[in-house]
Structure formats: structure tokens, C-alpha cells
A protein has these predicted regions:
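General beta-strand structural signal in soluble alpha/beta enzymes
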Residues: 8, 33-34, 55-58, 80-81, ...
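Conserved C-terminal alpha-helix-loop-beta "cap" of PLP-dependent enzymes
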Residues: 261, 268-311
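Conserved core of the PLP fold type I
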Residues: 52-72, 105-106
């Protein structure tokens, strides 16, 4: 265990106050639909984003995959960024679960642009997969925590609407973007057909993500969640932690962003650092000089109780 663990924002541990919130949360059976704390969490998110319904899921991967299985049919295609988590880090789920293909567009910071999306949309021809879903990630993990400007999202929404694409947001770190850009939850709820939001990253809950969308979409998604083994029983204990995170930890994300900027400034002054990607939120990417061995560097830090990860 590292004294200072900077490998990921997923390594958070519940505070004493969060643990107390978990212990005091009333529970029922979520599969039966009567866990009061889960119902409260789902209602909170639906109200904040202005969507009809929400669904509490075990992870961001599960929430994304449920959404994609709900939106796609075999032979369909997803337009996403080559850095996208749904493509790179979800076990080939688009192919294995939704029996669909992907096509890529976007810049080197993880951001997609309308002209690139337009170039990916297939003609209605039996030789081609059917362009069905436009999926973006905000913030972009591999892009270094980059955020979309709201005008960029509106432009992508316009493309999706014009060409009949379902617009999905992998919002694993959406609250980082909301804090960094001072954006509105309700605007996102209006712009997207489905949104996944992780609660166990910077927000600090131990487990869980939520999936947002229309009543019809969430009804279908709940069936898919059950099919893939995602129905859980006394999930209110975990929902209690998520509620605490939502009520207490959102504003504190700005502290993480400030810490990342301070670290970037420090690293930029070191002779052994080749380059530092200016952080927008809580992810900091930097490169070492060619004469530095990355694995040895990481091992040396680990010996000193500091954990970082290699991209």
C-alpha cells in the first residue's frame, strides 16, 4: 500500500463520515425495486440532470455496456474516439456484448469534432455497418482529463440529431468537467440520450455508477442489467456512500484540479522531465527524458511509498 497513491482517482477510500452514512442507510432489495436508498439515489440524479429515470450500476463499464447493448443491434456501428474507454478498456464489450463495430475520429487530446464525425457516418448501403451511436467521453481519460466546451457538445448533438444517431456520454469523470467548466447538469441531461457517471473516482464512493436516460431506455437497461448478472440486493449500503459523495464531495474536485496544476508546475522545472501535458482537471501526464527508464522510475517511487501509473 502506497503512502501517496497517484496511480488513479479510483484508489480512493471512504472517509469516516461516508462509512457512517453507509451504516445508517436503510436497505431493501433492489432487484425487487424496494431499496429506499437506491431509489433515493436514482431520483436525485434524475432530478439533477432532468432525465426521466436513472439506474444504479456496479461500475462505469457495466453502465456503458448496458447502454450500448440497449442502443445497438448486431451489425450496427459506434462512432467514438480512438482513446475511448468503451473501446480500449471494457474487454471488447462492444463486439462481445453488442455485436457491433467501431469507427474512430478525434484529436490527440481525446476530443471529437463534428467534421470528423460526419466523415464516419456510413451511407445507407447494405455493404456497410449501420451508423447508430455517437459516443463521447468527458473528461477524456487517455486525453489527460480534457473537457469539452459546451459549444462543442451542442455541435455534436446537432450532427447526431440530423443523422439519426443516438448520443451517449461516458461521463465517468463528468463532475470534474462540470466543476472545471462551470457547466450545468441539466444541460447535459437535455443534450444526451444516455449518460453514465462514475461515483467511485474523484467523488470517492467505494463502488458504483449511474446510468441516466428516458423511462423507456432505463426500463430496457434494467432488464439488461439483470441479464448480465447486475441485479443486486441490499445495494442501499453502497447507494448511501454515493449519496454522501454527491452531497459533499463535488465542490472538492476543484482541490484535485489545483493539486494537478501545482504538480505540473513542479515537474516542468525538473531536468529529467521531457514534457508535461497541461492538466485541465485531475489527470496529469508527463514524459521522461529518453535516458530515463520508465519502469525503473516507477519502481524507485514505489520504494519511497509513492504510486504512479504508466500509460
Amino acid at each position: 500500500m502506497f503512502e501517496v497513491d497517484l496511480r488513479s482517482d479510483t484508489v480512493t477510500r471512504p472517509s469516516r463520515a461516508m462509512l457512517n452514512a453507509m451504516i445508517s442507510s436503510p436497505v431493501g432489495d433492489d432487484v425487487w425495486g424496494d431499496d429506499p436508498t437506491v431509489l433515493k439515489l436514482e431520483a436525485m440524479f434524475a432530478e439533477r440532470f432532468g432525465t426521466e429515470k436513472a439506474l444504479f450500476c456496479v461500475s462505469g463499464t457495466q453502465a456503458n455496456q448496458i447502454a450500448l447493448m440497449s442502443h445497438l443491434s448486431p451489425g450496427d456501428e459506434v462512432i467514438c474516439h480512438p482513446y475511448a474507454h468503451i473501446y480500449n478498456y471494457e474487454g471488447g464489450g462492444i463486439a462481445a456484448n453488442a455485436h457491433s463495430s467501431v469507427v474512430f475520429t478525434g484529436d490527440d487530446r481525446g476530443i471529437m469534432h463534428p467534421e470528423g464525425v460526419l466523415s464516419c457516418i456510413k451511407a445507407d448501403d447494405v455493404h456497410y455497418p449501420k451508423s447508430r451511436v455517437l459516443a463521447i467521453e468527458n473528461t477524456s481519460n487517455k486525453g489527460g482529463g480534457t473537457c469539452y466546451e459546451w459549444e462543442e457538445i451542442e455541435a455534436l448533438r446537432a450532427v447526431a440529431s440530423k443523422h439519426g444517431l443516438t448520443f451517449h456520454l461516458d461521463g465517468a469523470r463528468l463532475y470534474n468537467a462540470l466543476v472545471a467548466k462551470n457547466q450545468s447538469e441539466s444541460d447535459y441531461g437535455t443534450a444526451f440520450d444516455s449518460i453514465s457517471i462514475c461515483l467511485s473516482k474523484g467523488l470517492g464512493a467505494p463502488v458504483g455508477s449511474v446510468l441516466l436516460g428516458s423511462e423507456e431506455f432505463i426500463h430496457h437497461s434494467r432488464r439488461i442489467r439483470k441479464r448480465i448478472g447486475g441485479g443486486w440486493r441490499q445495494a442501499g449500503l453502497l447507494a448511501g456512500a454515493a449519496i454522501y459523495a454527491l452531497e459533499n464531495n463535488v465542490d472538492r474536485l476543484a482541490e484535485d484540479h489545483a493539486a494537478a496544476k501545482d504538480m505540473a508546475e513542479f515537474l516542468g522545472q525538473q531536468s529529467w522531465v521531457k514534457n508535461v501535458v497541461a492538466p485541465e482537471t485531475n489527470i496529469l501526464i508527463f514524459g521522461l527524458n529518453e535516458d530515463m527508464d520508465q519502469e525503473a522510475f516507477i519502481s524507485t517511487l514505489a520504494e519511497k511509498g509513492i504510486g504512479i501509473s504508466q500509460m
